[in-house]
Amino acid sequence: MTTLASSIEHKTKHLAAPFENDENPWMKKYCCQCKSCKMSVPVQPWLPRFFVFGILCPVFWLVNLLAWWFLQYWQPHELEFHDLQEDEYPGFYEYEAITKRTVIPIKEEVLQEIRVMQNFSDSNSEEYYESKDGMPSSFLNVNTEQVEDENDTLKKYRYAFLKKVAHDVLESHDLLRKTFRDWNLRSLLGLLIDSILIIFVVLLCKKSR
């Protein structure tokens, strides 16, 4: 019986719909597609390393500053959104999966948007809030018996999904620029301190003569 149960559980995991796992469009993280962000992503992990190397060789601080200027200002850095294909939008299958699973985790901003739209359509949704790994998450519960027009409801979910995508893109763009700014301000501060120390040493040498 134990072997049979484990076999059934194993098959069940393989039969699980993609929406219920990692391909859930509500869980996917969308990033800015501007040229600046695309070029900055592979460079980002090197910023703290170059800062540490700069303590021994200040040239690395200059490299950080040049990369900051070239990637964050010289390159086009206007927000660009992910080109969503039709099959990437939550459809009827995803909507049914939501109602069957009762709850799905979504961002607080998206939950607020859906709540406002549902108030306009006189539908009564119940919101559940749970915590995962110590971080609060928002959950949406939709009762299909209270929805009269499926097409209208699907449009509302898609609109909320677009709001979520826009939020993700803006957040990723701002976070990447903030990371570059923080590390390069540290590099600039290191160069200033080194310059002051060099000037101080030169003045001391002149006085000693």
UniProtKB/Swiss-Prot annotation:
Gene Ontology BP terms: conjugation with cellular fusion
Membrane-spanning segments: 50-70, 185-205
Residues with PTM Phosphoserine: 121, 123, 125
Keyword Glycoprotein (UniProt): no
UniProt induction comment: Induced by alpha-pheromone. Repressed by the ALPHA2-MCM1 repressor.
Keywords (A to Z) from UniProt: Membrane, Phosphoprotein, Transmembrane, Transmembrane helix
Compartments reported by the entry: Endomembrane system
Stretches assigned to the Cytoplasmic side: 71-184
Lumenal topology ranges: 1-49, 206-209
Gene Ontology cellular component list: endomembrane system; plasma membrane
Membrane topology according to the record: Multi-pass membrane protein
Modified residues (Phosphothreonine): 153
Physiological role: Required for receptor inhibition of inappropriately expressed a-factor receptor (STE3) in MAT a cells. Inhibits signaling by relocalizing the G protein beta-gamma (STE4-STE18) subunit to intracellular membranes. May also be a mechanism for the down-regulation of the mating pheromone response after the zygotic fusion event, promoting the transition of the new diploid cell to vegetative growth.
Protein name in UniProt: Protein ASG7
Organism of this sequence: Saccharomyces cerevisiae (strain ATCC 204508 / S288c) (Baker's yeast)
